[in-house]
Amino acid sequence: MIKQRTLKRIVQATGVGLHTGKKVTLTLRPAPANTGVIYRRTDLNPPVDFPADAKSVRDTMLCTCLVNEHDVRISTVEHLNAALAGLGIDNIIVEVDAPEIPIMDGSAAPFVYLLVDAGIDELNVAKKFVRIKETVRVEDGDKWAEFKPYNGFSLDFTIDFNHPAIDASNQRYCMNFSADAFMRQISRARTFGFMRDIEYLQSRGLCLGGSFDCAIVVDDYRVLNEDGLRFEDEFVRHKMLDAIGDLFMCGHNIIGAFTAYKSGHALNNKLLQAVLAKQEAWEYVTYEDEAELPLAFKAPSLVLA
């Protein structure tokens, strides 16, 4: 049986909030089977829980938030959510003593290290996957995203940025997903932004944690970070990282082929909601026999050692 995963032990890290610029303590806790992914704000009394749920997602200019029925929110969840998807973590409590998850270096890599450090524990309950049965597509102007049936998890993402720093040949990225491929090829890709946007936001008391330490920063001509890019195509790889996190907001790894053109958080979420709303387009599946599991979701070699 393919089993649900959680952490072996509690781990903690500190970082800076992208919005406030203040120190945030992040605590990742193991959780029992069928808990799902729960984000928790401990700065509120009593603490407020935000279960990962496609319908709770709000996309803002700076980040993805989860918002509850009382309009309380937790921000900047997308990169940690991508790390959870990458390692196939089904059950976890994510605690922060702030309104947001720390931005760390703007990628998912620090969260991957934290999860690997905690260790992955298998629970004696079958892991549920969402399997795509029919093609579902959403559009917004010339942007679109779609899922098709496929026995695995493949991603094909194209961006269209007319910018001297982004070579035309580096605007498409395709990948057959696996935990190892995610860690090596996607997790280190950082978020990016324009210097002028960051300066404007900071002049209004926003994005106070934004810096060269947590993003690729560009002006109209070039990348301003002294160390340059981690990959030639880091921009499109980061958009794929975002998509992996966005699509895991249903709390389950998805079996299907994802293709997107110029998509972002809002359209990725619209696709996920469109799939879930169409009952005949998907089904929950479990695997009694590991041999039947799509290669994409085999346990990562270094994690379950």
Curated annotation (Swiss-Prot):
It comes from the Bacteria. Pathway: Glycolipid biosynthesis; lipid IV(A) biosynthesis; lipid IV(A) from (3R)-3-hydroxytetradecanoyl-[acyl-carrier-protein] and UDP-N-acetyl-alpha-D-glucosamine: step 2/6. Zn(2+) binds at residues 79, 238, 242. The keyword Heme does not apply. Its EC number is 3.5.1.108. It catalyses: a UDP-3-O-[(3R)-3-hydroxyacyl]-N-acetyl-alpha-D-glucosamine + H2O = a UDP-3-O-[(3R)-3-hydroxyacyl]-alpha-D-glucosamine + acetate. The active site is at residue 265. It holds the Pfam family LpxC. One of its GO terms (molecular function) is UDP-3-O-acyl-N-acetylglucosamine deacetylase activity. Its cofactor is Zn(2+). GO terms for biological process: lipid A biosynthetic process. Keywords: Hydrolase, Lipid A biosynthesis, Lipid biosynthesis, Lipid metabolism, Metal-binding, Zinc. HAMAP family: LpxC (MF_00388). NCBIfam families: lpxC. Belongs to the LpxC family. Catalyzes the hydrolysis of UDP-3-O-myristoyl-N-acetylglucosamine to form UDP-3-O-myristoylglucosamine and acetate, the committed step in lipid A biosynthesis. This is UDP-3-O-acyl-N-acetylglucosamine deacetylase. The lineage of its organism: Bacteria, Pseudomonadati, Pseudomonadota, Gammaproteobacteria, Enterobacterales. The gene is lpxC.
